[in-house]
């Protein structure tokens, strides 16, 4: 599934249109217990290149491309280079890329590829800063991994945003307060807040059966 949205600045002025491209579970070596991207985005049987051509082909207006639905940092460098090569025919209209990802694994070659290909903004997912809950969610990273990635990427001049969730199993109000305090301290460009949704055919769903 592909859709279009526009970014709006804090003065309410419409800026560049963002064209999201969904990459279900790309780079996810460990799947979070609540996640089933097939349900969230729909799985298009056509090749990724065909989907990109469909949404960008014939377009004249400038746009930004968002890469969502997977863990970009977990994609092997060769495959990441190949992914960006699919957008080469549209460099005349693409003004940059944004993406969402876990904070790990953060490799030097991955950072280099993202910089060379015009990635401007990275949304780092951190459902909670409680390491016990992160482990129960099968996130395969810790809160300290998020801090390290945020510092490294900020030093590389990427714009940074954060995503967190509420309603997690075992979560307390103290956990939520800790998350808010950490995000205020980190000062991301913006924050996305997601409620936990229990989807069929996920480990989380089976816990509720």
Task: List where the protein language model places each region.
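Conserved non-cysteine loop/helix-boundary elements of the Radical SAM core domain that shape
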Residues: 40-50, 69-190, 204-209
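Secondary-structure junction/capping motif
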Residues: 4-6, 172, 202
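Short microdomains enriched in Cys/His and/or Lys/Arg
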Residues: 49-59
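Short alpha-helical segments and helix-capping/turn motifs at coil-helix boundaries
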Residues: 4-6, 54, 107-109
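Short acidic/His/Gly/Ser-rich catalytic and metal-binding motifs that mark active-site loops
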Residues: 30-32, 199-206
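N-terminal pre-triad scaffold of radical SAM enzymes
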Residues: 2-41, 57-73, 98-102, 120-121, ...
């Amino acid at each position: 599934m592909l859709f279009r949205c526009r970014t709006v600045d804090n003065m309410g002025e419409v800026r560049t249109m963002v064209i999201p491209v969904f990459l279900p579970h790309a780079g996810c070596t460990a799947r979070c217990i609540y996640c089933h991207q097939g349900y969230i985005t729909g799985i298009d049987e056509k090749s990724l290149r065909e989907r990109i051509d469909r949404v960008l082909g014939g377009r004249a207006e400038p746009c930004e491309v968002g890469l969502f639905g997977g863990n970009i940092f977990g994609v092997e460098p060769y495959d990441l280079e190949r992914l960006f090569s699919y957008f080469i025919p549209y460099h005349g209209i693409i003004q940059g890329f944004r993406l969402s990802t876990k904070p790990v694994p953060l490799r030097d070659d991955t950072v280099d590829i993202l910089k060379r290909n015009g990635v401007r903004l990275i949304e780092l997912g951190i459902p909670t800063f409680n390491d016990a809950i992160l482990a129960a969610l099968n996130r395969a990273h810790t809160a300290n991994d998020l801090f390290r990635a945020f510092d490294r990427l900020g030093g590389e001049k990427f714009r940074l945003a954060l995503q967190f969730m509420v309603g997690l199993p075992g979560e307390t109000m103290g956990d939520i307060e800790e998350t808010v305090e950490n995000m205020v301290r980190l000062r991301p460009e913006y924050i996305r807040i997601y409620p936990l949704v229990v989807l069929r055919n996920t480990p989380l769903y089976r816990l509720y059966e």
